[in-house]
Amino acid sequence: MMRDFPSEDGIMMIGGASAVDIAAEFGTPVYVTDEQRLRENYRNVYNAFARFMDTKIHYACKANTNLAILRVLEQEGSGIDAVSIGEVLTCLKAGFTPDRIMYTGVNVSDKELKQVAETGVMINLDSACEMERLAEIAPCADVSFRITPGVGSGHSAKVTTGNKGAKFGIPLDQVISTYARAKDLGFNIEGIHAHIGSGGQVVEPFMDMMEVLIELVNEIKGLGIDLEFIDMGGGIGVPYKPQEEEMDVGELAMNLTDMIQEETDIDTIVLEPGRYIVCDSTVLLTTVNDIKDTGVKKYVGVDAGFNTLIRPAMYDSYHHVALANKFGKACTDKYDVVGPICESGDYIAHDRVLPDPQVGDLVAVYNAGAYGFSMSSRYNSRPLCAEVMVNEGKAELIREAEDFEDLWRHQIIPERLAR
């Protein structure tokens, strides 16, 4: 089920702190993360797998790269799945050591490959071409390979990554020859990796993917290569709607680890949850600026748009909304919750029943921790918003809101155009 929040005197509480007080102190829009929920989510997924076999969690930091959130997960013992040199450097700054980071890029330049290799992190290669280029840059690097399992799953076609013909990974008919070539090149080959997509809520596609990986592991063993781990990627979804059922992660863990232990000599499973760990730890708070009744539709206009949270506009994703200052009150009518961006596609929610919204009310947007701030932009010249973390009822700023100077801080007017 979707996460529920407590209230006090009709006010939504996040991690023991009043949503209204947080908005008053830090302004809106603002992302608010409950530190304890973050820790609980990490422990839930780790313990589900670790009771069956040696487990490494590589948090998919593309979901949320705030340094404070990364520090919490570093303290919990997480590793990192990074997809760019920027993410690698961010995680190193947050305190992760190189041995806890695996880099999985796609369509990577030689410049970035060199930068990544110099950090000492493991490189999960996406193509035979990338392998040949890395051999010139770091011939003894620790590597794994991302394969295309021919199995795809996700909340949207835009995030389904494992299907045949996808841009990600090494096609199945090239996997064995690629591993053989990597051995000849002298790489330290440690594992095999696949990722079927993001936000899946069904166990079966993960099992189908694991069957493919296991068959490949045993073929690769015939090359004289003993792999240390199978990396099942990420993609474990969470419920976004109030009555939506949650995937049974315990069942998933039991099924996948049973398959590995019964059919291979692999000792370690790696998984890369991002959404599962951070999604429901965070709420986006946004203030109602305008109410409009067109006679066809009623609108609640808020100060967060797709510049702040793009998932509804990009993926047609559902995010539950509630009035944080009228929490639990009877709802009166249906409204679209829309933002300040000058496009018709700028919306947070369609046709939601709300309790008589008024200018100045505070809208809470649920499940905002994954691919929220990390996908935000300055479109329409609107500065990026603040982020806050709550622990034991105390709210602390973990990212300052930008000011207008930040919009043009790195821009340069050539002297010939100066007055």
Model-flagged regions — what are they?
Residues M1-I123, A128-A141, G165, A182-I189, ...:
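A charged N-terminal "starter" segment
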Residues A17, V106, R146-G150, H195, ...:
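Generic beta-structure capping elements
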Residues R51-M53, L223-G224, Q243-E246, G295-V296, ...:
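Short, glycine- and charge-enriched coil/turn segments that flank and shape catalytic ligand pockets
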Residues T65-A68, T90, S109, G152-S153, ...:
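Flexible loop/turn segments at secondary-structure boundaries
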Residues I137, P149-D290, N380-R382, N391:
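Active-site loop/helix belt of alpha/beta enzymes
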